[in-house]
């Protein structure tokens, strides 16, 4: 059988971090010591029963058995507009300022292709969600990462963008609460980003994947649109995976600047499929859930974070307070790279974590653990790590 070469574009793409982790996990013998996977962010909690009941009823509706519209049902776009008005005080035109798609990855990967020209720069943070770097490659653009660190609360400083990069910027991508560090946005961050956008006439994309998960239930993460005029300069993507525990349902949307939405919708008709009508009906139900139901869904992560942070303190493993998302960003012990430490945990105690280097050079020296593994698994994993006495050596 002949073996054909991949295209130059595919050859130049980085190996997906999570596919690498999946391969590593498959190589571990777990018969005597079951693998505990803390590497990925797939929610372990059930989808709200109201949403499940909604899709069960919608599946039998013959109106959902044909090809769905590329634009999404008018009812789901109106539900999105109502949701944003209720939660963020933002008025949206359902026809021109909203796009729906099969999961937010399509949005954060597709919007760059819709607005960035070859040779331009996509500016984001380093570390960052790896898809932003691959989106630059697929757009034939350059990626410039603003290094963020613990000293800066993992927030970028746009004064650090070189003039050459700023002059040829095609898009700025932000993601707060931040994956992988858990950092929370401040009003000053979004104000600075907007000033940069206006100064250099560059659009903004805010990946609001962890919109519902601040450091506490009172600490509601900021939308980009909390800033005046932000809708004029950017778009915000939203996923149902985290807020509504609907990771397998594949539904997301983008809202904001009409010209960006229009460009993306055109790309969407050539590149992606549409969303099953029954899933759209279920999305309407999810968007209509009362605020207290949403708080119940995310309270699980707040409780887990509190317990895990307490356990980390017992291990003398330093951890930053006030982290959003359902991840914790942890410094590795002295003498290890992030990859070495991740491999040690996998081989010695069968605990899989995400090495910081997988999120960019700025992630070196850290690992990311997920709080979606369940209470017992999380504490059991930390007990296994404690048995290695790695942090006793640093005391």
What are the residue ranges of the model-derived segments?
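Hydrophobic residues in well-ordered beta-strands that form the structural core
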Residues: 124, 145, 173, 204-206, ...
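Conserved core of the PLP fold type I
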Residues: 60, 64-195, 212-213, 219-227, ...
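N-terminal small-domain helix-loop-helix segment of the aminotransferase-like
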Residues: 2-103, 110, 288-289, 391-395
């Amino acid at each position: 059988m002949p073996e054909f070469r991949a295209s130059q574009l595919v050859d130049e793409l980085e190996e997906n971090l999570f596919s690498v982790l999946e391969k590593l996990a498959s190589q571990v013998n777990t018969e005597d010591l079951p693998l505990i996977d803390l590497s990925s962010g797939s929610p372990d909690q059930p989808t709200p029963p109201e949403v499940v009941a909604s899709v069960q009823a919608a599946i039998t509706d013959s109106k959902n058995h044909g090809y769905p519209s590329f634009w999404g049902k008018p009812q789901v776009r109106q539900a999105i507009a109502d949701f944003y008005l209720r939660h963020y005080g933002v008025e949206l035109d359902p026809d021109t300022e909203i796009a729906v798609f099969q999961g937010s990855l399509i949005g954060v990967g597709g919007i760059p292709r819709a607005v960035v020209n070859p040779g331009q720069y996509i500016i984001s943070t380093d570390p960052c969600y790896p898809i932003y770097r691959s989106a630059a490659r697929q757009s034939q653009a350059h990626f410039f990462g603003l290094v963020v660190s613990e000293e800066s609360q993992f927030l970028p400083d746009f004064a650090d963008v070189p003039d050459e990069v700023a002059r040829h910027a095609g898009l700025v991508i932000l993601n707060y609460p931040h994956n992988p560090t858990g950092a929370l946005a401040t009003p000053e961050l979004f104000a600075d980003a907007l000033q940069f956008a206006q100064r250099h006439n560059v659009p903004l994309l805010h990946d609001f994947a962890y919109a519902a998960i601040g450091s506490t239930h009172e600490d509601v993460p900021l939308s980009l649109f909390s800033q005046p005029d932000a809708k004029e300069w950017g778009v915000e993507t939203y996923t149902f995976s985290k807020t509504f525990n609907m990771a397998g349902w594949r539904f997301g949307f983008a809202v904001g600047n009409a010209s960006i939405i229009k460009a993306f919708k055109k790309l969407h008709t050539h590149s992606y499929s549409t969303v099953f009508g029954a899933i759209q009906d279920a999305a309407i139900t999810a968007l209509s859930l009362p605020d207290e139901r949403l708080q119940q869904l995310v309270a699980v992560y707040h409780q887990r974070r509190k317990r895990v942070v307490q356990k980390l303190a017992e291990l003398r493993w330093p951890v930053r307070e006030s982290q959003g998302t359902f991840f914790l960003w942890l410094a590795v012990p002295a003498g290890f790279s992030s990859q070495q430490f991740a491999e040690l945990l996998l081989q010695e105690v069968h605990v899989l974590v995400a090495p910081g280097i997988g999120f960019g050079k700025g992630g070196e020296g850290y690992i990311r653990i997920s709080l979606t593994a369940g209470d017992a698994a999380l504490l059991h994993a930390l007990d296994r790590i404690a048995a290695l006495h790695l942090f006793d050596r640093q005391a």
